[in-house]
Regions:
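Short beta-strands and strand-loop turn motifs
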Residues: 19-21, 51-53, 82-86, 111-116, ...
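Short glycine/serine/threonine/alanine-rich loop segments
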Residues: 42-47, 79, 140, 178, ...
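Active-site-proximal cofactor/substrate-binding loop regions of enzyme domains
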Residues: 39, 46-108
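Classical nucleotidyltransferase
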Residues: 90-199, 278-282
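N-terminal catalytic cores of NTP/NDP-binding nucleotidyl/phosphoryl-transfer enzymes
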Residues: 7-67
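Short acidic-hydrophobic, aromatic-tinged amphipathic segments that line or gate anion-handling sites
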Residues: 2-8, 83
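Residue-level signal for inorganic ion chemistry
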Residues: 27, 74, 112, 172, ...
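Phosphate/ribose-recognition catalytic cores of enzymes acting on nucleotide-derived substrates
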Residues: 189-309
Length: 309
């Protein structure tokens, strides 16, 4: 999948179908929208693009996923390219300028697909109905997706963000369409886990990302062609008086050196709060309890359940 940054880069080589939105979380309503756009693109034999935004679009709200994490999902959903528009550079355009200058002239969009609550243009003055009218005036078409609910409530990024901050991972998974994950390159830690007999992989937490509930999670870690079960701690390791929040994952039944490699940690379920133990021996005993519980609760995890392949 190709990545473009607007207005620094524009894609002008032919016509396309564009899925429009901020897509924070790429939840089940977003996935439904992108799948609609994909089917249209396939039928019209046109490339499928995602048009989204960078910058403070949501008034300082914590992001569910970083752009890099979203790219991985976009590609798995069939996108040929993604355009990241600098929100600060385009926020003062009129709705007419947004459609005619960016979507149609610069990007070659002939069919756009957006959600019922999509807003665009100066002061968010453009809405779904004006998108349909402006695309038609430009010789194109806009398809508007209806609201999607789950459990009687609208599926929204705000709702998912609240679930993640409270550790309700299974509920978040049902709205996201796949387990929430973090991605990064494995860093060297202080080797504490190794000295306890539980070597861990350490990933930095994304700046500006959603604040996850601190504690221990049951997790899944794809490495190569295999999915491993894991136990992930999100927090500061209070037993050893560390300060920065990071993630440490003990990967069950894995032996290998993956320092410097990029991996994904899927958080399946919240197990317990982070605890400051009196001694390392007490911590080791608890990790064994966590490990045995994880083994008992883990079933076979498929690539499809992780939203992959």
């Amino acid at each position: 999948m190709q990545i473009y940054e607007y207005p620094r880069e524009t894609r002008i080589d032919g016509k396309c179908v564009l899925a429009l939105g901020f897509f924070d979380g790429v939840h089940i309503a977003h996935r439904d929208l992108i799948e609609t756009a994909r089917k249209i693109a396939e039928k019209k034999r046109l490339p499928l693009g995602i048009f989204t935004f960078t910058g403070d679009v949501k008034g300082g709200a914590e992001r569910i996923y970083s752009d890099r994490e979203k790219n991985r999902i976009f590609e798995s959903l069939g996108a040929d390219f993604t355009v990241y528009a600098d929100f600060a550079a385009i926020k003062d355009l009129t709705p007419e300028e947004f459609v005619e200058k960016i979507l149609v002239s610069s990007l070659g969009c002939v069919i756009s697909v957006a959600g019922f609550n999509f807003r665009f243009g100066r002061g968010a003055s453009g809405d779904a109905e004006s998108l349909k009218a402006l695309m038609a005036r430009a010789g194109g078409e806009a398809v508007i997706k209806s609201e999607i609910t789950h459990g009687g409530e609208t599926v929204s990024s705000t709702r998912i963000r609240n679930l993640l901050t409270s550790g309700r991972m299974k509920e978040a998974t049902s709205l996201l369409g796949a387990p929430y994950y973090i991605i990064g390159r494995v860093e060297h830690g202080n080797k504490t886990g190794r000295t306890l007999g539980f070597p861990t992989v350490n990933l930095p937490m994304s700046e500006g990302g959603v604040t996850l509930r601190r504690g221990v999670y049951r997790s899944a870690v794809p490495i190569g062609e295999k999915i491993y079960h894991g136990i992930t701690n999100i927090g500061t390791c209070p037993t050893f008086d560390e300060r920065s929040v990071h993630s440490e994952t003990y990967i069950l039944d894995f032996e290998g050196d993956i320092y410097g490699e990029e991996i994904c940690i899927y958080l399946l379920d919240f197990m317990r709060e982070e605890i400051a133990f009196s001694t390392p021996s007490d911590l080791k005993m608890q990790i064994n309890i966590d490990k045995n519980r994880a083994i008992k609760e883990n079933g076979d995890i498929t690539w499809q359940e992780l939203g992959l392949k």
